[in-house]
Every structure is written in structure tokens, then in C-alpha cells.
Curated annotation (Swiss-Prot):
Membrane-topology descriptor: Multi-pass membrane protein
Major localization class: plastid
Catalytic activities: a plastoquinone + NADH + (n+1) H(+)(in) = a plastoquinol + NAD(+) + n H(+)(out); a plastoquinone + NADPH + (n+1) H(+)(in) = a plastoquinol + NADP(+) + n H(+)(out)
Annotated EC: 7.1.1.-
Provenance organism: Staurastrum punctulatum (Green alga)
NCBIfam families, sorted: NDH_I_M, PRK12561.1
TM spans (from-to): 4-24, 31-51, 87-107, 113-133, 134-154, 167-187, 211-231, 242-262, 275-295, 308-328, 330-350, 386-406, 417-437, 465-485
Family: Belongs to the complex I subunit 4 family.
A single BP term in Gene Ontology: ATP synthesis coupled electron transport
Name the record gives this protein: NAD(P)H-quinone oxidoreductase chain 4, chloroplastic
């Protein structure tokens, strides 16, 4: 049972099943919808079963490994595995994609292609989180881009082609740096190309080479996360994409950058990370405030939510650079939490647009009375986004805050400045979120009154209520009992901060699990 290729099946099943969509009889869209939803649900249930029965939550290292030689001449293997860092993101991918497929029910134009692209995107994202080969990692990184571009360019707003072109230019540009970094690190040394991540993580590199490779990876991940100033594609993309696509972008795609940064830049290139981490922490703190201020100025609902995503990703940078397992665990939890919250906010923004036919906040108002279900669930998601105690966002941001404070690597002055800037961002967050809720659901203006009078507005359907409640339940569950998810990656976070990669490397890190500072070295 343990030797069964579960991860390969989980990865390839969606796209393989998607190839059968053209064979479905042309009897309307319902059959195609149910088929795509069934594929997503089966894959999600399968990964839940496999991880629940085969994964050792207290084990170390990569588990459920599969290694199949693919192209021998360049040592390219289908090499996949899962550990505490990737398991949560794989489960998040299955969960969000299943709900996004259900959210795409209103799509009627070319549904065969639409659902195939969603299933192809699903496989690409799963493959990236499970890849243990650098070239396979890059292959999945690129595979995921094609469906996203087509989903953006064919379904969305009037400026969807502009948004799709901007997205592909940014991400393709980042991919050039990603490929260059992969080739540099894999070809270094006398033993030929080495693409196995586990082998590469145990090697030592000259500091200059490590810095160069670190920067190459960082640029690629900075586009995807996104990090200022590589973030400008995100508001345009979210502003034009169909809301089911927005759920996939906010819920999963942004996490690919954070995952790659932790997996490669921190775990494999620890010496370079020690040099750049303070700058990234400062950049993350500045990004929180900058994106919050820009979000306040946005008049478009989806663009305001998009800039809130940029702001929240600043916390991921701070946690990843905190040099503490508490901060690193908080960064991972922030990615999971934002995946749920972002998907919920964009879904509700999209369903509100379907009813009001506007995304301009100044044209809204008074939607609370005719849309009580939408009002209550949107408010709940906004509360989770502003880190209300009892919601997942609060736990993640608190862990990151305490992680940077507990770090012994940084000076008290540096930590004081960062925490003060974080505090400013935390104060600004309710301003743009609560004002957004107020403009949408409270008060009236001439335009909103005319819309309310001229149209019969129905509240959220049972399908829509099910989707948003499915997202709210884990937000509350994590908020009240964070160990529900933290146990998935706490062990891995401690490994990363306590065992720097490479031979004869020494890095002073603090682990919140230990009472005193430790200096860890590896000698082989």
C-alpha cells in the first residue's frame, strides 16, 4: 500500500480526466459542470484519505516518495514527495479548486474549455507543491501559467486581454530568472546536473554563487507572491478575471511564490538568506503599510481586495525572515488563512456584481437589506481579513508578530521599528475593509436607489451559501483551535530553523520551542 504511486495519481488525475471532457455528450452545460466538480471532489477526497492513512505527521523529511526516471541524459526524474510544508498547501489546493469549480456554475460560454483549463491548472499547482526535482518544479510552474492566461483572456471583464497580457509578461519574465537559477545551481560542481532537491539541500556553495542563485529565485517568487514593486499585475488581473478564477489566483497561485521561497531560498540557500532576510523583513513591513494605503484609495471593489492581498503577503515576508519557527509557522498559516479569506472575499464580490452589475463602491449602498446573507457572510470574511480574534487571520498575524519579537538575530531597535510599522498596517487594515463594507451595505445614493428600484435582487442561493460557509468554517476552526493545522507543519518549521542546509554551515537561529538560543552546525 505504501509503495502505491498515490502522489502521481493525485497530480495527474485532474488533467487526465479533463482530456475526456470533449467526449461528454452535448446535452447542455450541467453534465460538464457535474463531471468537473466530481473530478475535483474525488481528487480532494483521495488526497485526504492518502494523507490521513499514509502520512506520518510526526515524521521528518520527505514522505511518500516516488522517483521515476524520465530523461536520463539530463537526470530529469518524475520525483515527487510530501512533507509538513507542502501537505497543507496541497490540501488547500484541493479544497479551493473544488469550491471554485462549484462557483463557476454560471459560466455558460464554452464550458468544455473552461473546466478543462481549471482541471489543468489544478494538476499544475498540485505538481508544483509535490515536486522534489527542480526541473519538475519549473515544468509545473510553467504548466500552471497557460491555463491561467487562457482563463483570464477568455472569461472576464472588458479589459481582460490587457490584464492577461500583463500577467503573462510579468510571470514569464520571472520564469526566466527561475530557470537561470535552476540551471546555475544544478550544473555547479563536477558531478554533472543535479536536480534532486534533497541532494541539493545538503550541498555547500560559494557565497557569491549562493547570493546570485538566491536573487534569481527571489525575483521569480516576488512576482508570484507578489512583492513590491512586482505587484502591479495583481490588481489588474483580479479586477478583470471571473470570480471563480480570482478564487484560484488568491487562494492558491499567490501561495506558489511563498512556498518556493521557503522551500528553496530558506531551506537550500540559508547563508544567502541570512544576508537578505533583514531587507526582506523591512520590505514586508513597508509593503503592509503601502498596500493598505493604496487599498484605501481604490474605488473598485475587486481592486481594493487585491491590494489587501498584497498587504497581507507582507506578513509572509516578515515571518519567513524572522529566523524563528514561530514566525515561520505563522507565515505558512498566513498563506493558508489568506487562501481561505481571499477566495471568500472575491467570491462574494463576484456574486454581488452578478446582482448589481457594478464594482464601483461609490455606486453601491443599501445592499444590506435586500442581501442579508451576502451582507453577513461578506462582513464575516472582512472580519477574518482584519484579524479579528477568533478568526484565522488573527492567529497567523499574532504568530508572525511574536516570532519577530522573539528572534535573537535582530537588534532591539530593528525589531521595535518593524513592530511599529506592522502596527500601523494593522491599524490601516480595518479602515479599508470596514469602509468597503459600509459603502456596499449601508446607506443609499441615487445610483444604488435606482438599481434597487429597477431590478429584482435575490439574495445568495443555496449553492452560494454552501460555498461561503465552507470557507468560513475553517476560518473559524483555525481561529479557535489553530493546532488543527499547525500540527501539519510545526515539525517542518523547526527543522528549517534548526538545520541550515549545506556542509559546515553554521547559522544562529532561535526556535520558539527551545528556552535558549541555539547555535546549530552541520558537519559531514
Amino acid at each position: 500500500m505504501n509503495n502505491y504511486p498515490w502522489l502521481t495519481i493525485i497530480t495527474l488525475f485532474p488533467i487526465s480526466a479533463g482530456l475526456l471532457i470533449p467526449l461528454i455528450p452535448n446535452r447542455g452545460n450541467n453534465l460538464i459542470r457535474w463531471y468537473a466538480l466530481g473530478i475535483c471532489l474525488i481528487d480532494f477526497l483521495l488526497m485526504t484519505y492518502v494523507f490521513g492513512s499514509q502520512f506520518d505527521f510526526y515524521g521528518q523529511g520527505i514522505q511518500l516518495k516516488e522517483d521515476i526516471s524520465w530523461i536520463n541524459v539530463i537526470d530529469f526524474h518524475w520525483r515527487v514527495g510530501v512533507d509538513g510544508l507542502s501537505i497543507a498547501l496541497v490540501l488547500l489546493t484541493g479544497f479551493i479548486t473544488t469550491l471554485a469549480t462549484l462557483a463557476a456554475w454560471p459560466v455558460t460560454r464554452n464550458p468544455r474549455l473552461f473546466y478543462f483549463l481549471m482541471l489543468a491548472m489544478y494538476s499544475g499547482q498540485l505538481g508544483l507543491f509535490l515536486a522534489q526535482d527542480l526541473l519538475l518544479f519549473f515544468f509545473m510552474w510553467e504548466l500552471e501559467l497557460i491555463p491561467v492566461y487562457l482563463l483570464l483572456s477568455m472569461w472576464g471583464g472588458r479589459r481582460r486581454l490587457y490584464a492577461a497580457t500583463k500577467f503573462i509578461l510579468y510571470t514569464a519574465g520571472g520564469s526566466i530568472f527561475l530557470l537561470a537559477a535552476i540551471l546555475t545551481i544544478s550544473l555547479w560542481g563536477p558531478n554533472g546536473p543535479i536536480l534532486d532537491m534533497e541532494t541539493l539541500s545538503k550541498q555547500s556553495y560559494p557565497l557569491g554563487l549562493e547570493i546570485l542563485v538566491y536573487l534569481g529565485f527571489l525575483i521569480a517568487y516576488a512576482v508570484k507572491l507578489p512583492v513590491f514593486p512586482f505587484h502591479t499585475w495583481l490588481p489588474d488581473t483580479h479586477g478583470e478575471a471571473h470570480y471563480s478564477t480570482c478564487m484560484l489566483l488568491a487562494g492558491i497561485l499567490l501561495k506558489m511564490g511563498g512556498y518556493g521561497f521557503i522551500r528553496i531560498n530558506i531551506e537550500m540557500l540559508s547563508d544567502a538568506h541570512r544576508i537578505f532576510a533583514p531587507w526582506l523583513v523591512a520590505l514586508g513591513a513597508g509593503q503592509i503599510v503601502y498596500a493598505a494605503l493604496v487599498s484605501i484609495a481604490q474605488k473598485n471593489l475587486k481592486r481594493r481586495i487585491a491590494y489587501s492581498s498584497v498587504s497581507h503577503m507582507g506578513f509572509v515576508l516578515i515571518g519567513a525572515g524572522s529566523f524563528s519557527d514561530l514566525g515561520l509557522s505563522g507565515a505558512i498559516l498566513q498563506m493558508i488563512s489568506h487562501g481561505l479569506i481571499g477566495a471568500g472575499l472575491f467570491f462574494l464580490a463576484g456574486t454581488t456584481y452578478d446582482r448589481s452589475r457594478t464594482l464601483i463602491l461609490d455606486d453601491m449602498g443599501g445592499w444590506g437589506s435586500p442581501l442579508p446573507k451576502t451582507f453577513s457572510t461578506f462582513t464575516a470574511c472582512a472580519m477574518a481579513s482584519l484579524a479579528l480574534p477568533g478568526m484565522s487571520g488573527f492567529v497567523a498575524e499574532l504568530m508572525i508578530f511574536l516570532g519577530i519579537v522573539a528572534s535573537s538575530v535582530y537588534s532591539p531597535l530593528f525589531k521595535a521599528i518593524i513592530t511599529c510599522v506592522e502596527g500601523i498596517g494593522i491599524i490601516l487594515t480595518p479602515i479599508y475593509l470596514l469602509s468597503m463594507v459600509r459603502k456596499m451595505f449601508y446607506g443609499y445614493n441615487d445610483i444604488s436607489l435606482k438599481t434597487l428600484k429597477d431590478s429584482l435582487i435575490l439574495d445568495a442561493s443555496p449553492r452560494e451559501v454552501f460555498i461561503i460557509l465552507s470557507l468560513l468554517v475553517p476560518m473559524l476552526g483555525i481561529g479557535f483551535y489553530p493546532d488543527l493545522t499547525l500540527q501539519l507543519w510545526n515539525q517542518k518549521a523547526q527543522e528549517i530553523v534548526s538545520l541550515p542546509s549545506g556542509n559546515e554551515k553554521s547559522l544562529t537561529l532561535i526556535s520558539y520551542s527551545y528556552p535558549v538560543e541555539k547555535n546549530f552546525s552541520l558537519h559531514h
